[in-house]
Amino acid sequence: MELPAVNLKAIVFTHWLLTVFACMIDWLPKAYGLANITILAMGVWAIAQRDSIDAIFMFLIGLLLTILTDILLFALYFTEAEKASESGPLRDLFRFSSGMGIFSLLLKPLSCFFMYHMYRERGGEYFVNLGFITLSRDRSSYQSIEHMDPPADQDNKLPSRTY
């Protein structure tokens, strides 16, 4: 099964837009915006250097880490911010902002999946095997090197030394 072609620019732009929408109202700490914008800067680095394995790997690891930090920050700050904005004039804006933050969090694992495949296309060497899901390249067209024919020219072979 072939994966759909997903542009790295589209992934970075989507996460940037969702991060901006999530930070529209001041209900999350500055760590949320700082972490996500820093990771998106790594995404811009991965766009700028198309052949860099390090850039795409750092972006992938950063997205994985922001999944954890987003879960932690939402768990710590959501209920208090919801109670504070429940009867105020910013209730709808809080709902929109928190919805965009949650949507960004839900979209990050899919983005990580596409980032991993881009990493493998650029020459990355990490394999992931989850039992029923195997992420690897099809190498059936490669010739095996285990059964190579011996060279025909063995006259130039050096004699073995005895010590």
Curated annotation (Swiss-Prot):
Q: List, alphabetically, the GO terms of the cellular component aspect.
A: membrane
GO terms under biological process = angiotensin-activated signaling pathway
List the membrane topology term(s): Multi-pass membrane protein
Instruction: Give the transmembrane ranges.
Output: 29-49, 56-76, 96-116
List the keywords (alphabetical). Answer: Membrane, Transmembrane, Transmembrane helix
In this UniProt entry, which residues form the Extracellular topological domain(s)? 1-28, 77-95
Q: Which InterPro entries does the record match to this protein?
A: AGTRAP
Q: Which residues lie on this side of the membrane: Cytoplasmic?
A: 50-55, 117-163
Q: Which protein, by its recorded name, is this?
A: Type-1 angiotensin II receptor-associated protein-like
- Please name the source species: Xenopus tropicalis (Western clawed frog)
